[in-house]
Swiss-Prot record:
Keyword annotations of the record: Cytoplasm
Chief location: cytoplasm
Known role: Required for morphogenesis under gluconeogenic growth conditions.
Family: Belongs to the gluconeogenesis factor family.
Record bears the keyword Cytoplasm: yes
Organism listed in the record: Clostridium acetobutylicum (strain ATCC 824 / DSM 792 / JCM 1419 / IAM 19013 / LMG 5710 / NBRC 13948 / NRRL B-527 / VKM B-1787 / 2291 / W)
Biological processes annotated in GO: regulation of cell shape
GO MF assignments: LPPG:FO 2-phospho-L-lactate transferase activity
One Pfam family this sequence matches: CofD
CDD domains: YvcK_like
Protein's name in the database: Putative gluconeogenesis factor
UniProt cross-references to InterPro entries, sorted A to Z: CofD (IPR002882), CofD-like_dom_sf (IPR038136), Gluconeogen_factor (IPR010119)
GO cellular component terms, A-Z: cytoplasm
Leader sequence residues: none
Length: 451
């Protein structure tokens, strides 16, 4: 490892290196004097130089022990695991030290979109708090919710895995779904979290324990510990109950969603979540189903108020495609207006929108399911005072349009740097570190494309 790597700002070793150098200087000077001129000195001079050697040795001891403590503290806190890969120790320390000091980001949502985004963000900061919806009542999560009375674990499991630092085999195991018997279509990860809930005092503790086992970067929190039920009032006046039923009934009645609400309406947010929003550099809403994954979180008591009061940069990641039964014919401004309406005030400063396109074949496939690319209506967004950040976020996976986790993370980090960190002098080290990291990732991308 190069010497320059040890003296980079933020690694907290430079001070001990300098102190150690001072100790070596004291010892060297005293020894040189005693060896070359010792016979000419009386006992008092000799005692002085011996004293210098003792002081130098003490200083050297302090510098070595404190320097090692600085390294070991990273390992003990779980920020550094030298066995994870073959990168050099100094580079790992520098990277982990700055990730710990990276921008404080709160990501609010649920479903596949949120976990996809988290996979990209964890490479830029470890100060991530993922706030996840607990209104899911379908699939394996719904079955466990009904049978065991626990909060739905599916979305939380996906976010934990997205932020975890585990072997691929462990991730495959936790994502495995049983194919037969009474557990058919049930995820092992859901069962793992349900078992963890059984040995914990509450669901929040169970999530913390699972996060600890899987070495999660940041935190994953349920938006509330209350057993909430999601309801929707359609424009025709019909009230639909259940997250999984809402889009289906909207399609059946051919009536769009007018309003979303939760019961109990006084469900309380975790104090830790509210505090994270208050202290955040940026709060990200989405991506995810607007009415069933994003907005339900904002209806929980204290979350909406915290968003209105926070000084954090507030970003909304718009969906790429409209969703049948939820956002039919919606433009980007329609998404933002729906959020504003339900919170009761403006909570979006900038919205990230996709300007990429898909093949005609894929457009036709989605059109047959009454879905299309979300329209970017810049004029309407200007009218409501919401900035636009554009990028090509499309990634085709298994024939479906998905967000590209790496690309969306880069754009988000660049936006946070330019709109928030650039004006905060205390974050200057993180700003330059993130700039360097982004450049490295861009360079790596070009090399991969060239190959």
């Amino acid at each position: 490892m190069k010497f320059i790597d040890w003296i980079k700002p933020g690694i907290k070793l430079k001070r001990w290196i300098m102190l150690g150098g001072m100790g070596v200087l004291f010892i060297s000077f005293a020894l040189a004097e005693l060896i070359t001129k010792g016979s000419y000195y009386n006992v008092y001079y000799k005692a002085f130089y011996i004293f210098l050697i003792v002081v130098g040795a003490f200083i050297l001891y302090i510098s070595l022990t404190q320097g090692m403590k600085s390294i070991i503290s990273l390992i003990n806190k779980g920020y550094l695991n030298v066995s994870l890969d073959s990168r050099k120790l100094g580079n790992l320390i520098y990277e982990k030290r700055l990730l710990v000091k990276g921008p404080k980001i709160v990501a609010i949502g649920g479903g596949t979109g949120l976990s996809t985004m988290l996979r990209g963000l964890k490479y830029y900061t470890s100060n991530i708090t993922a706030v996840v919806t607990v209104a899911d009542d379908g699939g394996g999560s719904g079955a466990l919710r009904e049978d065991l009375g626990i909060l739905p674990p599916g979305d939380i499991r996906n976010c934990i895995l997205a932020l975890s630092d585990t072997e691929p085999l462990m991730e495959d195991l936790l994502q495995y779904r049983f194919k037969d018997g009474r557990l058919k279509n049930q995820s092992f990860g859901n069962l793992f979290l349900a078992a963890m809930d059984g040995i914990s005092t509450n669901f929040e503790e169970a999530v913390h324990k699972m996060s600890s086992v899987l070495a999660v970067t940041g935190k994953v929190l349920p938006v509330t510990l209350d057993n909430v039920v999601l309801k929707a009032k359609l424009k025709n006046g019909v009230v639909v109950e259940g997250e999984s039923n809402i889009p289906e009934q909207a399609i059946l009645y051919e009536s769009p969603i007018e309003k979303i609400f939760i019961e109990p309406e006084n469900a309380r947010a975790l104090h830790e979540t509210v505090q994270a929003i208050k202290e955040a550099d940026a709060v990200i809403l989405g991506p995810g189903s607007l009415f069933t994954s994003v907005i339900p979180n904002l209806l929980v008591k204290d979350i909406g108020n915290a968003l209105l009061k926070t000084k954090a940069l507030k970003l909304y990641v718009s969906n790429i495609m409209t969703q049948p039964g939820e956002t039919d014919n919606f433009s980007v401004s329609d998404h933002v207006n729906a959020i504003t309406k339900h919170v009761g005030g403006k909570v979006v400063d900038y919205t990230l929108v996709n300007n990429g396109t898909v093949s005609e074949k894929l457009k036709k496939k989605y059109f047959e399911k009454t879905s299309e690319l979300v329209k970017i209506d810049k004029n309407e967004l200007d009218k409501i005072g919401v900035g636009i950040v554009e990028g090509n976020f499309i990634k085709i996976k298994d024939g479906f349009v998905r967000h590209d986790s790496d690309e969306i993370a880069k754009i988000l980090v660049e936006t946070i740097m330019d709109k928030k960190l650039f004006y905060d002098r205390k974050k200057i080290i993180e700003y330059f570190y993130l700039s360097q990291r982004l450049k490295e990732n861009r360079k790596l991308e070009k090399e991969n494309r060239g190959n």
